[in-house]
Amino acid sequence: YAAFLALGEDACAAAWEMDTVEGAREDSACLLTLLHRPSRLQLALLLEAKDSGCVADALGGIRAVLGADGMRRVFRAVLTDNGAEFSDEAAIAALLGEGPGETRLFYCDPRRSDQKGACERNHVELRKLLPKGAGLRFDRLAPADLALAMSHVNSEPRGALGFSTPARAFRAMLGDDAAALLDAYGVGDVALGDLDLTPGLIERARAERGDAPLA
């Protein structure tokens, strides 16, 4: 973490934070979340299991969208915790486009998840749709559920952004790379009057598709 801070204030402010979010105790699946500090844009990707191989697969999916050059443009610094799912430092760093003599992947100090507090705080918004302790089965989640959830989360105006939305701010900051990433994961703009940050949003969409409830 000291090396992360040594990047300087501007680089730290422009970094990403990476974490995982768990569902019910009996689930194998979990979510990989990536938060872009400047825009507050958060992605949530489904992992079949909370392990380093699944994290690498998810980041590989992002790399397939952006390409090697795009990964280097977008993910200049990523801060995560010391969870076992992030233990394959070499694989993650390579996927981020880390070159010889540089570092793009950084770790919080042990037991200091507050050092990536923006990601943790934004999980509050995600948990409005997927509340903890409600018995929701992440093993049943589909990419369409996450696309819907993150479209709503990232369309909520934020005071820190001058009441713009994370999705709009992200596109303004990262242009075509941002548009490609959001399109690939189905994250679109939701009008203010249509915002729904309640568990019913996903359950209604699942019912319309004929999918079983999450709980």
Predicted regions and their residues:
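Short, conserved catalytic/metal-binding motifs centered on acidic residues
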Residues: 18-19, 40, 78-81, 116, ...
